[in-house]
């Protein structure tokens, strides 16, 4: 009974599996029943294993490798299973564990569970158990314990562990070896047996990176494929160096997949396993699984993904709306279609069979990918309109399939009345009222009538108009696609009545009313309405005329003199020119002036060539230019011209400004007499001499002259542009002797006409001897030669002279406000003179000026703070100077070529747009322009610094020539200079002097005293400027302290009259000036401020 029970128990466990606790068997037993046993060398021993099921042995040596080991089964009558292991001729290699276990409990992956006994076979010649092939390699996880398996054949043997000759402390067990935490490297075990020392071979310890948990990630590029495509799946293991990874997939049986391993060590350890299945078929659909197992620990992780393979691509669409849809007018509505497709589809929308444009703002389409093969397409109506009604179609297609869906959309529009009019039937008095309405759905039209016109504000006075009323006919509505028209006819209207048209549909009801007037009353109303309309037209016409008259541009002088500045520097107070005194010394008799041809004409006045008699001692007859207003000038314009005269009298003379010579203000129109400039304005001169410049500089490419508005191939056009500037208000070339207009005036008989007058002595620069290789070039710059050849040095000379002239104006706190090449004239000897030529320019028809209120502004020349903040300072003139440089080195080009002055232009200026370098400018010159165009005014250079910068670009001989000419000008009896001095001979008649030096001192004192008395009527209190130290005075140029003046003008508006000697000027030069009776300070007149 006991035997059969044991057999039944074993069979039950075999059938149900070893994992059930109810089938758990007792472990087999080993005889002898000991944990360990020592066996003599070369002796024999046997071990018996007894168990309730079939048992087997595990031992150090396999039966195939060792014939001295024999395992056999024995039968007994107890029903137990017995297996005997017998070893003959035992050796040290038989030392180790012997385990007896049940066969049914053992699998390939599980550890052996059973009874164990350890056998020692001491061998005096072999202290350590022989090692296997892999025993010398010890793999351990980082910071984990490990066993170095140097086992001894005798349990009594003492063993030590060494690492590179160093003793390593560690716990030792003769059945396992040394146990502990070891660093990476070689280790040797050493034992001494009966005086003999035994050493093992090296044990190499390797540390591998591993974690307690496997971090496994699976990635499939896609999960849907077509037949013939390649399936790619990857699994990545992180932070583990030794991992066993197995793939399970549908094609594994056919060995179809290709596996690859890639190791990535940076920034962290990563093992990437890739499975590739080429030429996939439908059979390759299914689950793809990767299972990773750690090499040093019993840790496993698994990931899987489902992949489907289709014979061909597919498209499926699922709309979320019906085939008939309606939206309300101005409603925002989305129509969503769910799409599933592979490969990636192309989705398009059509309206009434026409493709919708993607950039429409009222109807938009959008496609979003939600999953690998799932998409969502949206058609969005933004504020739906009536014309949005129609048939909409979505088409989804790829290379293998196509699907579409169409729906009809209607826009529901509330009823509205488009028109309500009455038609008269002639003298019979009959009238027909037509009411046109629209809406979706089409509205219905009803009629109502109110016979008591005064009570029509009350709804109870209205009655529905029946179709069977006598003398009234109601017609059926005429229906269109979205409009309907209803009519009602009245045979005769004898009194005023009101008719109401009602249009209604499901969305709204609207009404409109119309009065029907009897024919007699209508004629009376028509006459009254006509009179009223005529009266309104007259009133509006008068208003328009007044506005036009007030907006008519008025002449005003652009120059302004700064009186004071607010502490924050954002508000400037300018001197009122009318409050300035006018010195009668400037008055010139009218009978001494003969007027000739017109040099320039504008909307307000003109400039005329004239001949002045007795203007100076050295030149009794002088050619001059005369400014005057037109006979139609208004009083405000006369006042502006007088203001210009007063400002010029107080500025004083300078070589590089158009100097005032005299004026006629009494007994007739105001004449301002100024210097006559031989070559006219600078723009004209640059245009005219462009070809000569290009011939001297062949390295400059002759590009299209678009910036000039010229066609280089059309000589007639170019000639016209150069020679016809009188018509558009520019200063005419004074060398021309063509037939021009003349101003009739008294002509003195005893003198020749203006054409025979000799040139002014002050217009002819002094000659000088050739001193260097550059003298010939400099001589062409400042000479009396009529040659008009233009060179790069000429352009630099113009640039320098304008800077000097503007430096002088800045020293007087004078802001020009219209600095441009058209306001720069060229005198004999190519002397540049700055002027304000707005009086003789037709600015209303000049494209360079833009209308703003009642004035015209040169916007392209203006600084940003002047354009946007109406702020004009010397530093805003610096900006204009940069534009002027661009004009000069583009040979008269128009700034910002091709750009209109509009909102785009203003936005570009605000955003920092600047012009590129003109063709003929050097990098140094362009750098000056860029500095002048700094958006922050305080960072722009002053005219003093600009003069110094340009001066350094010119030959040294040029500087000396210029200073000599400037000095000669100030020493001459030029009317502009002479009138600012007191005639010493007249002032001190009868006084005897010991020497000329005493006479000069008294003359200077008299001049200063007279100056103070002349200006005492108008003195503006401004803070003084610190005097220049004597040490610095020797290194500065002879100027009116313009640098100090310009910089301080930003804060105080003050100026200084300190005399500063130039670098290239000698003390002898100043003494020579003193000898001729000129105070050194007279070189730069004291500001009237």
From Swiss-Prot:
Kindly give the membrane topology term recorded for this protein.
Single-pass type I membrane protein
Annotated spans, Disordered: 1018-1089
Q: What induces it?
A: Up-regulated by growth arrest.
Q: Name one Pfam family in it.
A: Ig_PDGFR_d4
Instruction: List GO BP terms, alphabetically.
Output: adrenal gland development; anatomical structure morphogenesis; animal organ morphogenesis; cardiac myofibril assembly; cell chemotaxis; cell migration; cellular response to amino acid stimulus; cellular response to reactive oxygen species
One cellular component term (GO) for this entry is: cytosol
User: What is this protein's tissue specificity according to the annotation?
Assistant: Focally expressed in cortical interstitial cells and highly expressed in the interstitium of the papillary region. Also expressed by adventitial cells in arterial vessels. Up-regulated in areas of renal fibrosis. In mice with unilateral ureteral obstruction, expression in cortical interstitial cells becomes prominent at day 4 which increases progressively until day 14.
Q: What class of enzyme is it?
A: transferase
Q: Indicate how activity is controlled.
A: Present in an inactive conformation in the absence of bound ligand. Binding of PDGFA and/or PDGFB leads to dimerization and activation by autophosphorylation on tyrosine residues. Inhibited by imatinib, nilotinib and sorafenib.
Q: EC number(s) of the enzyme? A: 2.7.10.1
Q: Where are the transmembrane segments?
A: 529-549
Report residues carrying sugar chains. Answer: 42, 76, 89, 103, 179, 353, 359, 458, 468, 506
Q: What does this protein do?
A: Tyrosine-protein kinase that acts as a cell-surface receptor for PDGFA, PDGFB and PDGFC and plays an essential role in the regulation of embryonic development, cell proliferation, survival and chemotaxis. Depending on the context, promotes or inhibits cell proliferation and cell migration. Plays an important role in the differentiation of bone marrow-derived mesenchymal stem cells. Required for normal skeleton development and cephalic closure during embryonic development.
Question: What protein name does the entry list?
Answer: Platelet-derived growth factor receptor alpha
The organism named in the record is: Mus musculus (Mouse)
